[in-house]
């Protein structure tokens, strides 16, 4: 057995080399685990149970990486990706678009369950619930501007810019098709944000189009959000996450709540409603931009304390 392990370690793979293998299970980060000649590979664009041909994209001491270049035995859950850029030579996002929506949720549940078991030593089964349609949900995007002034996304684990003409995960108000049709300052980046009211910010180190801040509304609460402050990119995530956090927190009137990594105060607002005037909420955040927004959002609330720090 020890001799076999030693021989497996001696096997050196080359970038560009191809082999046939079977995808075993999902891993964190949109990858899938497969093995070949005793070596572990993290594979993109596969589905567990599929027999595939893999091309090696990088090598390492403990594991290697590869892309599926041909599917020999496809899974019943394999579908045609709706986006033209969701492939091995496309942009680095949307790792699961080749998989049916129901199987995507199952795979994400497996990843979270495995993380709790491996890191926290907890036997916790997590179900990923359907929130909304699988496309047109992202309210924020960062685009790379290449040397010719054209906008695009980076390829997977790469600084190569992939020019695009649209992004199907972005909400229509971001107007990605219009953004990518324009010429920008070369070798920079664009940060684009939108809220559910239809306002859009385009920032290139500074805001160059649109309002300086967006106003987000979640339930009865209103938040100022600057372009450099964190806000959930999924348009429905703020409301869904707030409801989940408050269910777990079970805050009562008069309680003291600590909102770590509090951002602009999304959960602080909900916690404040629960603890009432006799309670207190302390928000801690490392981003000076988010802190500035939080002070605007809660500046006149006496029982909310805001701290800059990590």
Protein language model annotation of sequence segments:
Residues 2-310:
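Accessory RNA-recognition modules of RNA-modification enzymes
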């Amino acid at each position: 057995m020890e001799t076999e392990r030693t021989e497996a370690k001696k096997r050196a793979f080359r970038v560009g080399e191809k082999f046939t293998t079977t995808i075993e299970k999902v891993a964190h980060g949109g990858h899938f685990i497969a093995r070949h000649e005793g070596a572990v590979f993290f594979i993109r664009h596969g589905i567990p149970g599929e027999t595939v041909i893999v091309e090696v994209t990088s090598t390492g001491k403990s594991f290697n990486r590869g892309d599926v270049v041909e599917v020999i035995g496809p899974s019943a859950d394999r579908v045609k990706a709706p986006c033209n850029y969701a492939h091995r030579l496309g942009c680095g996002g949307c790792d699961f678009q080749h998989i049916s929506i129901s199987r995507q949720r199952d795979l994400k549940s497996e990843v979270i369950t495995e993380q709790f078991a491996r890191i926290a030593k907890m036997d916790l089964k997590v179900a990923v619930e359907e929130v909304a349609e699988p496309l047109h949900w992202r309210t924020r995007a960062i685009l790379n501007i290449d040397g010719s002034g054209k906008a695009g996304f980076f390829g997977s684990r790469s600084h190569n810019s992939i020019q695009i003409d649209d992004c199907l995960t972005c909400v229509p108000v971001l107007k990605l098709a219009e953004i990518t049709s324009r010429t920008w300052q070369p070798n920079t980046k664009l940060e684009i944000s939108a809220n559910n009211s239809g306002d859009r910010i385009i920032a290139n180190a500074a805001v160059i189009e649109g309002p300086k801040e967006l106003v987000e509304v979640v339930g009865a609460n209103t938040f100022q959000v600057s372009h450099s402050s964190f806000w959930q990119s999924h348009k429905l995530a703020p409301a869904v996450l707030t409801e989940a956090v408050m269910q777990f927190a079970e805050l009562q009137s008069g309680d003291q709540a600590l909102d770590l990594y509090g951002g602009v105060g999304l959960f602080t607002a909900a916690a404040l409603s629960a603890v009432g005037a006799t309670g207190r909420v302390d928000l801690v955040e490392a981003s000076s931009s988010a802190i500035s927004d939080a002070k605007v959002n809660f500046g006149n609330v006496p029982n909310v304390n805001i701290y800059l720090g990590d």
